[in-house]
Swiss-Prot record:
Disulfide bonds join C100-C173. Residues 1-27, 91-100, 168-178, 354-366 are extracellular. Glycans are attached at N7, N14. Its main location: membrane. Residues 238-280 are annotated as: Disordered. Residues 53-64, 124-144, 203-329, 388-436 are cytoplasmic. It is found in: Cell membrane. Keywords: Cell membrane, Disulfide bond, G-protein coupled receptor, Glycoprotein, Membrane, Receptor, Transducer, Transmembrane, Transmembrane helix. This is Alpha-2 adrenergic receptor. Belongs to the G-protein coupled receptor 1 family. It comes from the Eukaryota.
Length: 436
């Protein structure tokens, strides 16, 4: 929200514009820094979008929030920051009152949408933690897209007033500076969503802490599960058993003992085996267990069951660890967003309450203003530093682009050099895909 006043003055017939507020060196430095911010914002957030849409590890429905958030940051970098930079360097608004109204509305829209996105993400995480089974079944792409649409509608409603409350002046672009509007817009656009985010993440932390204190440990890592077919206790001397091991010493050791076996019974008139699952084990007689049927008795292989259970447990653990990493990353994103925008909104609101008595220095206020814009370029950096899945996806995207350029250059070579180059390109791409 640009509240920088212009240095333009009007005479009766002519418009006299004061010199630029910065020296050439200072202006060049500011342009360079802001250009880097714009470039990082666009490239980084485009990478985020491509990574979420193409990486298998990032294709969860809830990550669509990150795609929408990245789109908002790209729009800030393309439709807001360049005009703010021009207004800052020249010292007056050059683009007319009509675009000024749209510019201020877009500024409020994208800033508000960013924090409302983070608010929606925090609620999504909270529901996934507190209502894991029921909510995760409802956590479909369609539902997430509906939530994203609501986020943008809320942001659009909040950003509508600047279109009708802008001061119409060809040489300055100022938003409504009335106290009621400053306080209400700051409350709705920042403080209220920020309070909701912080409260929700505190609850998530509390729930996670309670769960981590309750640990269920099964002996040997797994509990014994009943087999899919009927499980009986049968005396060894009444049946001829097929055991994986025909060792005589093992047979002597098991003799006259009641052992847990897997009974697969098939009727002579049926080709398909009939199996039934019993939750309670029963002690039965051999004749009652298989009356006039072809019976095959084999020892239960706990190794096969254990391997299946380990595979399921491993997948569940990987999903839980990925969810924890993402929750941590989003906590960092939320914290950085608050740190970037809090100084601006605090001084903006404080000035509306106290007036000139607590007005911050102009240079400090401008610094807070531009720190808020820097947030658009920070999220991709956070994803890269703190999340391994994003790091792998970014690396894969960059390497694939590099491999594509190498292939293009290979097409210009001849003979064996061409074939060798193409082979190396494919090899690098395949190695990277295998590693991921």
């Amino acid at each position: 929200m640009d509240v920088t006043q212009s240095n333009a003055t009007k005479d009766d017939a002519n418009i006299t514009v004061t010199p630029w507020p910065y020296t050439e060196t200072a202006a060049a430095f500011i342009i360079l820094v802001v250009s880097v911010i714009i470039l990082v914002s666009i490239v980084g957030n485009v990478l985020v979008i491509v990574a979420v849409l193409t990486s298998r590890a990032l294709r969860a429905p809830q990550n669509l929030f990150l795609v929408s958030l990245a789109c908002a940051d790209i729009l800030v970098a393309t439709l807001v920051i360049p005009f703010s930079l021009a207004n800052e360097i020249m010292g007056y608004w050059f683009f007319g009152s009509t675009w000024c109204a749209f510019y201020l509305a877009l500024d409020v829209l994208f800033c508000t949408s960013s924090i409302v996105h983070l608010c929606a993400i925090s609620l999504d995480r909270y529901w996934s933690v507190t209502k894991a089974v029921s909510y995760n079944l409802k956590r479909t792409p369609k539902r997430i897209k509906s939530m994203i649409a609501v986020v943008w509608v809320i942001s659009a409603v909040i950003s509508f007033p600047p279109l009708i409350m802008t001061k119409h002046d060809e040489k300055e672009c100022l938003i409504n500076d009335e106290t009621w509007y400053i306080l209400s817009s700051s409350l709705v656009s920042f403080f209220a969503p920020g309070f909701i985010m912080i409260t929700v993440y505190c609850k998530i932390y509390r729930v996670a802490k309670q769960r981590s204190s309750t640990v269920f440990v099964a002996k040997n890592g797994l509990e014994r599960q009943p087999s899919q077919s009927e499980t009986c206790f049968v005396r060894k001397d009444k049946f001829e058993k097929e055991s994986p091991s025909s060792n005589s010493s093992e047979s002597n050791q098991r003799q006259e003992e009641l052992d847990d076996i897997d009974l697969e019974e098939s009727a002579t008139s049926d080709n398909k085996p009939k199996s039934s699952r019993f939750s309670n084990r029963r002690r039965v007689d051999g004749a009652r267990c298989c009356p006039q049927r072809t019976c095959r008795i084999s020892w239960v292989s706990s190794q096969e069951q254990s391997s299946k259970q380990l595979a399921v447990a491993s997948k569940t653990k990987v999903a839980q660890m990925r969810e924890k990493r993402f929750t941590f990353v989003l906590t960092v994103v939320m914290g950085v967003f608050v740190l970037c925008w809090f100084p601006f909104f605090f001084t903006y609101s404080l000035h509306a309450i106290c007036g000139d008595s607590c007005e911050p220095p102009e240079a400090l206020f401008k610094l807070f203003f531009w720190i808020g814009y820097c947030n658009s370029s920070v999220n991709p950096i956070i994803y890269t530093i703190f999340n391994r899945d994003f790091r792998k996806a970014f690396k894969k995207i960059c390497l694939l682009d590099c491999a594509a350029h190498l292939r293009d250059s290979c097409l210009g070579t001849l003979g064996r050099l061409n074939a060798k180059c193409i082979f190396e390109c494919h090899q690098k791409s395949n190695q990277e895909e295998t590693a991921n």
